[in-house]
């Protein structure tokens, strides 16, 4: 079985040599047959067209960290590792797109990243390795983080919002309440449809008044799986 490994650049300092080692080792039965390093191309992307202030609150990277970025790219080039980025899209969108392509080829994917936004991709034949925790993410980890199964993560994020990315969500609704609502009503769309029936006054009012924010938020947090990537998965 072919195993494709997709890695976000933030994992590189820990995993650059590990990837190389695994790719050459004959003893590792799960060694990747293909892998790529995925970079963000720029701060702004198509999501800023949906919501201008998306990630607008992000501060600049610490001064001592900035020089490392170019060394990461240089390391990737020096080791002749395939790297991919695409203007107007985030690295997460490319990972989502390539993951779907890999599944269509009947192969498996390992995503190496600590980014919680990638948890929505977790399913059969797609596993996620968190280099910060040195472990593979499980269904239980995702449930502990978001209170729902992987396919409903975006619905919880849409309601709760995300202050780190400036995703608005619905004011007054956190992850716990969002998970409660999604587990009860199934989807964000159904929550909004049935919002008038919710007994808690404040919660009902917030949902009714902020439907548009919730809908926009879901568009922001949902990863694109059909990005017009230039490189084929076999490259």
Go through each PLM region and give its residues.
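Noncatalytic, basic helical substrate-engagement surface that gates or grips nucleic-acid strands
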Residues: 6, 11-112, 116-136, 213-216, ...
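Short, well-ordered junction/capping motifs at the entry into regular secondary structure
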Residues: 1-3
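Non-catalytic nucleic-acid-binding/docking modules located in mid-to-C-terminal regions
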Residues: 25, 29-36, 79-81, 104, ...
């Amino acid at each position: 079985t072919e195993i494709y490994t997709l890695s976000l650049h933030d994992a590189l300092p820990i995993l650059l040599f590990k990837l190389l080692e695994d790719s050459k080792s004959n003893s590792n039965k799960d060694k990747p047959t293909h892998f790529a390093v995925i970079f963000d191309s720029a701060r702004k992307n198509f999501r800023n067209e949906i919501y201008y202030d998306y990630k607008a609150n992000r501060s600049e990277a610490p001064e001592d960290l900035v020089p490392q970025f170019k060394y990461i790219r240089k390391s990737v080039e020096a080791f002749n590792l395939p790297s991919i980025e695409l203007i107007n899209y985030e690295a997460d969108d490319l990972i989502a797109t390539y993951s779907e392509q890999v599944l269509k080829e009947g192969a498996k994917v390992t995503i190496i990243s600590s980014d919680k936004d990638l948890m929505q991709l977790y399913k059969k034949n797609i596993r996620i390795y968190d280099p910060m925790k040195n472990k593979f993410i499980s269904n239980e980890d995702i449930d502990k983080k978001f209170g729902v199964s992987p396919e409903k993560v975006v619905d919880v994020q849409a309601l709760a919002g995300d202050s780190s990315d400036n995703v608005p969500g619905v004011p007054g609704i956190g992850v716990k309440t969002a998970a409660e609502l999604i587990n009860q009503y199934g989807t964000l769309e159904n929550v909004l449809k049935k919002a008038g029936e919710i007994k808690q006054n404040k919660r009902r009012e917030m949902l009714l008044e902020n439907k548009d924010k919730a809908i926009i938020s879901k568009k922001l947090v949902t990863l694109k799986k059909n990005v017009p990537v230039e490189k084929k998965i076999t490259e």
